[in-house]
Amino acid sequence: MAFEFRLPDIGEGIHEGEIVKWFVKAGDTIEEDDVLAEVQNDKSVVEIPSPVSGTVEEVMVEEGTVAVVGDVIVKIDAPDAEDMQFKGHDDDSSSKEEPAKEEAPAEQAPVATQTEEVDENRTVKAMPSVRKYAREKGVNIKAVSGSGKNGRITKEDVDAYLNGGAPTASNESADSATNEEVAETPAAPAAVSLEGDFPETTEKIPAMRRAIAKAMVNSKHTAPHVTLMDEIDVQALWDHRKKFKEIAAEQGTKLTFLPYVVKALVSALKKYPALNTSFNEEAGEIVHKHYWNIGIAADTDRGLLVPVVKHADRKSIFQISDEINELAVKARDGKLTADEMKGATCTISNIGSAGGQWFTPVINHPEVAILGIGRIAQKPIVKDGEIVAAPVLALSLSFDHRQIDGATGQNAMNHIKRLLNNPELLLMEG
């Protein structure tokens, strides 16, 4: 038998991933630790190395397909490794042995399942923790129907099984489900006649788009958003960047306006610490964060990513500029790691790079605030009693009204405006 390599648990609480790219094909000879594939989990791309040396027999999952942790994704001819077990691959034989060691009382549901016909060849999709939970409860997990995505079994399914609900994943139930689907399909052809006038195509929702959608819905459903919009004369900031742009270039740094905004935001978070918290309503707690990590929303071909500048308060403008540029390149190339996209305490979203001005940015939950920056545009302003043209920056600050009051939000906005209006203050107060 070939060694069946299953999608491992790659951490971050992610139970599935999209196979973005295969680096091997049937017949390839591989060594241990060679990269087999790239898997998109949540918002990061993770390289999956081979745990064994051998010859690839068959790639089981095509590119663009979502696989669940524990699914066989590739078969490798590696005779010395056939019996090896890896994280995300539970040995189902243990689920048969352990329940036998425990004699459950006659009234408990598991005893009833002993007499039920269970397909032992059935493929089970379940996390290792769920398999362990089933064994502890004395349940043969192959007898449980999965209600999760792609039929994945959850702890709730095990509990339902114990309580007598949806007891088995029998062939009869599968057949009835299939019959129901077949019965419903005749309605579909009715839309075919409209194809000539109103053509439509469909595609699977990519893993990243699903992750973005889930995060946006969760944020808007959880946090009551309030957005403040303002603008600021940034002539001094413009001149300051122009003055140091060449010096930065000599050091290999591409200086933009964004690092200035990062430093101004960090200063505001320190002055108004309510913006640097998380509001945990379920636990009845407010989490105060004594570190300042700034997320930078980045637009890529695959969707929105938010790499994080860690400990931004300890870094110079040049250092922040370099880090933002490096993270942006990684984001575009799909090389960001999960660690590079977690831990933000507040986020900046730059719609100005796309030519926008004011907008209502969505909070990157569980953060409680997000600063949106628009484009810098020449506008008429009143200065010393005269109307003059000046570069003006649009700012939008969204915050969670459960934690931040309107006055606090506006005071934080005013502080940011003050620093960007006079960037030398960043050295004194930032």
Curated annotation (Swiss-Prot):
Its cofactor is (R)-lipoate. Keywords: Acyltransferase, Lipoyl, Transferase. Residues 84-104 have a biased composition (Basic and acidic residues). SUPFAM superfamilies: CoA-dependent acyltransferases (SSF52777), Peripheral subunit-binding domain of 2-oxo acid dehydrogenase complex (SSF47005), Single hybrid motif (SSF51230). Residues 80-122, 164-200 are annotated as: Disordered. Its EC number is 2.3.1.12. Forms a 24-polypeptide structural core with octahedral symmetry. This is Dihydrolipoyllysine-residue acetyltransferase component of pyruvate dehydrogenase complex. It comes from Staphylococcus aureus. The gene is pdhC.
